[in-house]
Amino acid sequence: NEDAPCVMHLKERYYLQVPCYKRDLLADMEIRLAKEKSEQGIDNAMYLRQYGYKISYSKFCEQKFRPDYYFIYLNEKVKGFKNIYKLPEGEYLCFREKILEENWNPQRIINYFQGKEEPKLMLAMEYEDNLDNYAHANYEVQILLKKS
């Protein structure tokens, strides 16, 4: 099953992020990130085409999509710019989920972490082909299990 969770080793990655606020619509986050990209003055060739969200494990378990940050990946490390961050290299639990749908069920992930420490880093990545019908889109969720 291609939607079954699997553990993957992911290399260090860099990204530009902006905060998300409680009342934000998805469009508000996109506009804020586009403005930040413009203000940074980083060459557009430095950005990859994948966007994502930093989300909280507790909100995920409550079936609430309330991201803390919205981000875009960079293809390499850049120095001297604000709001550029690094995701650590390590082991990540990865799976696909339709986290914007009302009836999705986080139980398999809750079961996975039962009796374990609550994850500190959780990401939800957009797929490019989801840009038309985002309400029913699959997201790739990555949860840091262990840094390398």
Language model regions located:
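A solvent-exposed interaction/effector surface
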Residues: 1-148
